[in-house]
């Protein structure tokens, strides 16, 4: 199957699936970014979180939304107050941890070059832990990740180990990180718009130049004829694509689909 057609099939399948996240919808601060990417032929998003402050308990007992071996006592995508945390801590029976998790976004890209464009946008926006993964089946994934997280234990065996004053101090830091996270998402959206506009203009100019230059058109046709010969396979194309990525992007990983 043609690579572009296969990517289109993957995209249609992914976007038709129900949202299985706890919230069941895209976070408000990430909506514009997600909609912009999904409106383009070369991208689609597979998961996202705009950033959140949460309080997790290491026990699966008590109230809250349970996930794996911990209990979610509190989760918010907005700035958090001390009273909210203190009330939630009453449900802690084990090792309660206060966390801030920054924006994360997973995007499947049509080509490695598309992923590299998006990777540059992410790095320039402040998401320095972003990286590209190329799977064995040719799926190219870009993870947009930040490094400005926070994780602090508050209780041990259900007993509060810090003062309320310290919790208020931690929330001040977490809320500041939340605001900075929101600014970075805004930068990412703006930079992404400019990058996609440049790509569109560049592609348009290349097509016009090719149409107006008979010699260029003749050379391209000869190149295409060679590329379609029996010695060229899809696997060879992937190897060439992978090689380009290793030269250009340091954050490239090979893995399973």
UniProtKB/Swiss-Prot annotation:
Biased composition (Polar residues): 225-234
UniProt-listed Enzyme Commission number(s): 2.1.1.282
Region (Disordered): 202-244
Gene Ontology process terms (BP): methylation; tRNA processing
SUPFAM superfamilies: SSo0622-like
Keyword set includes S-adenosyl-L-methionine: yes
Modified residues annotated as Phosphoserine in this record: 25
Pathway terms, separated by semicolons: tRNA modification; wybutosine-tRNA(Phe) biosynthesis
Chain segments annotated as transmembrane: none
Top-level taxonomic group: Eukaryota
InterPro entries noted in UniProt: tRNA_yW-synthesising, tRNA_yW-synthesising-like_sf
Catalytic reaction(s) noted: 4-demethyl-7-[(3S)-3-amino-3-carboxypropyl]wyosine(37) in tRNA(Phe) + S-adenosyl-L-methionine = 7-[(3S)-3-amino-3-carboxypropyl]wyosine(37) in tRNA(Phe) + S-adenosyl-L-homocysteine + H(+)
GO molecular function, one term: methyltransferase activity
The entry's keywords: Methyltransferase, Phosphoprotein, S-adenosyl-L-methionine, Transferase, tRNA processing
Keyword Transport attributed: no
A family per Pfam: TYW3
Protein's recorded name: tRNA wybutosine-synthesizing protein 3 homolog
Source species: Mus musculus
């Amino acid at each position: 199957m043609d690579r572009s057609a296969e990517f289109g099939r993957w995209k249609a399948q992914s976007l038709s699936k129900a949202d299985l996240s706890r919230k069941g919808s895209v976070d408000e601060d990430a909506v514009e970014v997600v909609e912009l990417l999904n409106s383009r032929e070369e991208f689609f998003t597979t998961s996202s979180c705009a950033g959140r402050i949460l309080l997790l308990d290491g026990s699966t007992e008590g109230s809250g939304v349970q996930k794996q071996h911990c209990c979610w006592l509190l989760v918010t995508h907005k700035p958090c107050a001390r009273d909210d945390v203190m009330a939630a801590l009453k449900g802690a029976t084990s090792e309660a941890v206060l966390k801030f998790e920054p924006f994360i976004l997973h995007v499947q890209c049509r080509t490695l070059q598309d992923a590299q464009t998006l990777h540059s946008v992410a790095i320039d926006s402040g998401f320095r832990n972003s990286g590209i993964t190329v799977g064995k089946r040719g799926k190219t994934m870009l993870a947009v990740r930040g490094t400005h997280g926070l994780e602090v234990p508050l209780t041990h065996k259900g007993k509060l180990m810090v003062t309320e004053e310290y919790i208020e101090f931690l929330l001040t830091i977490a809320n500041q990180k939340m605001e900075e996270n929101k600014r970075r998402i805004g930068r990412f959206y703006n930079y992404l718009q400019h990058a996609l506009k440049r790509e569109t203009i560049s592609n348009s100019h290349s097509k016009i130049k090719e149409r107006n230059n008979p010699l260029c058109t003749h050379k391209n046709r000869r190149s295409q004829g060679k590329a379609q010969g029996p010695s060229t396979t899809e696997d060879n194309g992937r190897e060439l694509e992978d090689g380009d990525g290793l030269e250009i992007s340091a954050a490239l990983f090979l893995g399973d689909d």
